[in-house]
Amino acid sequence: MKKILLIDDSDTYTWCLQKYLQHRGYPVKTACTLKEARAAIQEEMPLVVCCDLDLPDGSGMDFLDEVRAADKELPFILASCHDKDDYEQEAMRRGATLCMDKMKGLLLQDKLVEYAYRQV
């Protein structure tokens, strides 16, 4: 079964979101770096990608470009603690499905991931 791919370098944040989504019945795969995310996508294309904007080995925005080159329709959510006004317009131009503030809480993220999940 295809999974939601969570990409974030915060172990605590990833763990919380993973447990939250799994509790609601979503299968989840996690990655802490873009290298791990690329390997996960080569193994199996996810149903939804939820990616942090800033990662240790690159930008979530650049990873969005890579994903869009391979799949134009895959729901891709870009998440960050940064002000969305700083990156949202560029992310949407590059093909992001949604942009969200990680600090808005897990409920909002669950609803946004659920929305993207249903789009497929």
What are these regions (language model features)?
Residues 33, 59-62:
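Acidic catalytic/metal-coordinating carboxylates
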